[in-house]
């Protein structure tokens, strides 16, 4: 009997298990595990008086910091730590303690259940409701049993760290959307260039491509689509069909496959032939410089974290390289799909390799004739863009200079007005000081006059009292004198009548009384003179009271002058602020002017380098004439000839077999 080998690839299929019971048992076990973990953590919190669930976000934060340091560098990790610390401090200061603990615990348990494989379903929602109910009904009010000061920073971290991660997620989402938009724009441009390339092909190849498209559409309409068909964003391509294709298409497919692997490693979309390596090295340098300038423009518009900036640079560089090299690679729809990332099956790959080995190398010459001019045509675009940028920068420079001149004129006018205002302020200050001195002297004189008036009024009252008292005494003396005279007359008459004695004593008494009367009259005259002087002083004081009204007028004038000086000081401070703003604007304009000049110098240097490299490439490029004797297709006329190349003073040999750069 013959010995038979078993086919290891055809293994016996295992028996089908009941997935319904498996899912039920697995989900119930999973949710029971969640409940057990939750109960254990709550028990540990109650026993040890610490919220252990707050340590889980802290552990996530440490892991994210380690990952950012490992994959994105120290600068981004430090920035991430600073942002998270700031968010934690804000939550710690501005959120009340009870609401902080409630939100932190609720978020931790909801996020823990959310990380399961089930997603949003009835058990997860029920667990969320249970957690929220327990936190709101029981633990929201019982904060006395815990170390509040120790748990509060961790609770703030449980809220601040998710806010930071949500912010970074939103930023990455926005950058992803912008990147998709850019990819769509590049895809449209590639399709446009693909159509141009298809229209530039000879009519025979166009007919072959039309037949291939019809066959592809027919293959798409079949119901039995195999798993070997790969879907791409530009269209699906069947990988298992066997059609008679020409040699250029097969070569483009093979080159697209080989270069697609390199593009995944280096993020470059350039697929060149092995024959064009010395020529394409210079072309790649020019395209790299153009892509570097375009990536700078995109980086100015899309400001973000370092990770997203690097991703956007690589994405824009790959898309621009793909667009510039589309003339070399994308000459058929199959090569276009291969460069965009679709990979054919192994059977079609072996078939294409066998066909490629059997064909002649004449098709490489045709490809060179079709590829080189399209790359050469894209070279002046960089110079045109750089010249446009230089014109824009020169216009900005002139505008900034005009603004600088206007600002300088405004500063000079403001400085002159400031000098005038300062002189006026000095005069007003001197006048104000004089008025204040006068006012001070007037106030002092007024106080002294008030004191003198009060003293004189007291003296006047005393003099009036003394006068009234003296008048009373005088009246009494007159009455007494009259009585004495009457009694004396009676006594004289009686003495004359009765006796002629005691005449001398009476005469002496009369003399004394007359002397006293004279003294009293003299005192009366003195008192009257004093009363007249006091009345004159009272009149003078009344006149002074009338003069006080003039001092009030001076006070009102002084207050008006003070208001005016305050207004002038405010206007002077406002003008100084405007002057400072103008100086800051002048500094900004100078800085922008220096930046623009630096950019102009950089652009001039780049233009010189590009012109030098283009001259070297054109000097190295010989005139291409190839014979197509063995090719069944008609030769394609080249789109570029070395006769149209401008003569440059380069010292390179255009007829050299291998390009060798000059040694300096």
Swiss-Prot record:
Region (Disordered): 253-274, 320-375, 630-664
Gene Ontology molecular-function annotations: microtubule binding
Topology class, membrane: Multi-pass membrane protein
Amino acid composition bias (Basic and acidic residues), ranges on this chain: 253-265
Biological processes per GO annotation: brain development; chemotaxis; neuronal signal transduction
Annotated glycan sites: 324, 340, 452, 655
InterPro entries for the chain: Macoilin
Pfam families named in the record: Macoilin
Localization per Swiss-Prot or TrEMBL: Nucleus membrane; Cell projection, Axon; Rough endoplasmic reticulum membrane
Residues bearing the modification Phosphoserine: 305, 332, 631, 634
Record keywords, A-Z: Cell projection, Endoplasmic reticulum, Glycoprotein, Membrane, Nucleus, Phosphoprotein, Transmembrane, Transmembrane helix
Main localization category: nucleus
Gene Ontology CC terms, in alphabetical order: axon; neuron projection terminus; nuclear membrane; nucleus; rough endoplasmic reticulum membrane; synapse
UniProt function note: Plays a role in the regulation of neuronal activity.
Alphabetized PANTHER family for the sequence: MACOILIN
Family classification: Belongs to the macoilin family.
Record's protein name: Macoilin
């Amino acid at each position: 009997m013959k010995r038979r080998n078993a086919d290891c690839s055809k293994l016996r299929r295992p028996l089908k298990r009941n997935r319904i019971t498996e899912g039920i048992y697995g989900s119930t076990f999973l949710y029971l595990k969640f409940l057990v973990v939750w109960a254990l953590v709550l028990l540990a919190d109650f026993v040890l008086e610490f919220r252990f669930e707050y340590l889980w976000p802290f552990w996530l934060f440490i892991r994210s910091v380690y990952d950012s340091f490992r994959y994105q560098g120290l600068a981004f990790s430090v920035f991430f730590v600073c942002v998270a610390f700031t968010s934690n401090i804000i939550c710690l200061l501005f959120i009340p303690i009870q609401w902080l603990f409630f939100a932190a615990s609720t978020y931790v348990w909801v996020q823990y259940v959310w990380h399961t494989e089930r997603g949003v379903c009835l058990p997860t929602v029920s667990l969320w409701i249970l957690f929220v109910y327990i936190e709101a009904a029981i633990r929201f009010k019982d904060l006395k049993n815990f170390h509040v000061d120790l748990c509060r920073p961790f609770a703030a971290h449980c809220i601040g760290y998710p806010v930071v991660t949500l912010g970074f997620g939103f930023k990455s989402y926005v950058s992803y959307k912008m990147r998709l938009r850019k990819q769509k724009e590049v895809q449209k441009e590639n399709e446009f260039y693909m159509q141009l390339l298809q229209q530039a092909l000879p009519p025979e190849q166009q007919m072959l491509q039309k037949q291939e498209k019809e066959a592809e559409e027919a293959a798409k309409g079949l119901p039995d689509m195999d798993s070997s068909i790969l879907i791409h964003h530009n269209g699906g391509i069947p990988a298992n069909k066997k059609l008679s294709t020409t040699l250029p298409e097969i070569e483009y497919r093979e080159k697209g496959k080989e270069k697609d692997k390199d593009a995944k490693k280096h993020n470059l979309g350039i697929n060149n032939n092995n024959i064009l390596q010395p020529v394409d090295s210079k072309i790649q340098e020019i395209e790299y410089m153009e892509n570097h300038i375009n990536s700078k423009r995109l980086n100015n518009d899309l400001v973000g974290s370092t990770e997203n900036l690097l991703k956007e640079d690589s994405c824009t560089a790959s898309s621009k390289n793909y667009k510039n090299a589309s003339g070399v690679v994308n000459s058929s729809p199959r090569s276009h799909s291969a460069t965009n990332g679709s990979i054919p099956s192994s059977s079609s790959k072996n078939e294409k390799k066998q066909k490629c080995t059997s064909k002649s190398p004449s098709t490489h010459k045709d490809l060179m004739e079709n590829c080189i001019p399209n790359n050469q045509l894209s070279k002046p675009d960089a110079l045109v863009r750089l010249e446009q940028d230089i014109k824009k920068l020169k216009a900005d420079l002139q505008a900034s200079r005009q603004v600088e001149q206007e600002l300088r004129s405004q500063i000079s006018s403001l400085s002159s007005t400031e000098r005038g205002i300062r002189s006026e302020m000095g005069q007003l200050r001197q006048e104000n000081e004089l008025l204040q001195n006068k006012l001070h002297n007037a106030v002092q004189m007024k106080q002294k006059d008030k004191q003198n008036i009060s003293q004189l009024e007291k003296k006047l009252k005393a003099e009036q009292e003394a006068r009234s008292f003296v008048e009373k005494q005088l009246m009494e003396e007159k009455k007494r004198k009259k009585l004495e005279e009457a009694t004396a007359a009676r006594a004289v008459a009686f003495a004359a009548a009765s006796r002629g004695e005691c005449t001398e004593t009476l005469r002496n008494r009369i003399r004394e009384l007359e002397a006293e009367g004279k003294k009293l009259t003299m005192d009366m005259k003195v008192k009257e003179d004093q009363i007249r002087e006091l009345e004159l002083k009272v009149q003078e004081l009344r006149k002074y009271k009338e003069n006080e009204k003039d001092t009030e007028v001076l006070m009102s004038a002084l207050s008006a002058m003070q208001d005016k000086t305050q207004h002038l000081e405010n206007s002077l401070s406002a003008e100084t602020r405007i002057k400072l703003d103008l100086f800051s604007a002048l500094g900004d304009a100078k800085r922008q002017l220096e930046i623009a000049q630096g950019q102009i110098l950089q652009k001039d240097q780049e233009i010189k380098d590009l012109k030098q490299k283009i001259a070297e490439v054109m000097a190295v490029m010989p005139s291409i004439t190839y014979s197509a004797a063995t090719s069944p297709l008609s030769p394609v006329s080249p789109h570029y000839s070395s006769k149209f190349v401008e003569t440059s003073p380069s010292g390179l040999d255009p007829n050299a077999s291998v390009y060798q750069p000059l040694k300096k």
